[in-house]
Amino acid sequence: SFVSRGLGDVYKRQPTSLVKLENLSNHLGGAQIWAKIVSEANGGAHKIYNATVHALICKAMGKKYIVGDTGAGYAGKMLSMAAKKFGLRCKIFMGIKDIRRQKPNCDAIRKNGAEIVPVYTGSQTLVDAVSECMRYWVSNCDTTHMCVGSTVGPNIFVKICGWSTAQISRELKTQLKNEFKKIPKKLKLINCVGGGSSAYG
């Protein structure tokens, strides 16, 4: 786990909080409504979990370069943070349209020492950034590891993303047991879906 590697409190600020939304619960009546504040994770998003696992894999393989894709910029920002933490050289592939829309995250990526590679092909958004990133990785896989930011691409990358992001669920199970003594039988989980990484987790 992240904690056993000594990365928990310092690097991930885990576990992220589980808080009861008292006013909303009272307003709707009946059900208790809780929220897991994953935005407390270092960098402001759950993407740090996947980025950290891939950085550790890259180090374990003896590779010095890591590449990744990003759309809104969070996956790229987190990977640039993880790369900086573990002394890796980093390239982030990003559609030119997304670069124009996501200046704050692009600034953060560059501040962490990573290079943003603009993608001008196709829709000039995430789907093409993923494709260009994979093309680059296939041509440089002897020296470079690839981190896929969402549950897309070859099966192993989907599994790594799902396993690492399941840190959300691992924390949640412990927090529910601490709060209710057991996991409630009538429990409904609601999560947004974009690329699928947090939903998988």
Where do the PLM segments sit?
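Single conserved hydrophobic/aromatic residue that forms the stacking wall/gate
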Residues: 1-7, 11
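Gly-rich Lys/Arg/Thr-decorated short loops/hinges at beta-loop-alpha junctions or inter-strand turns
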Residues: 4, 29-40, 58, 111, ...
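Short, structured coil segments at secondary-structure junctions
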Residues: 6, 86, 112-113
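General beta-strand structural signal in soluble alpha/beta enzymes
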Residues: 14, 33-37, 67-68, 117-119, ...
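Helix-rich "cap/lid" substructures immediately adjacent to catalytic or cofactor-binding pockets
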Residues: 20-65
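A short, small-residue-rich loop immediately preceding and capping a beta-strand
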Residues: 42, 58-82, 86-95, 185-198
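Small/polar-residue-rich loop-to-helix segments that shape phosphate-bearing ligand pockets
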Residues: 91-183
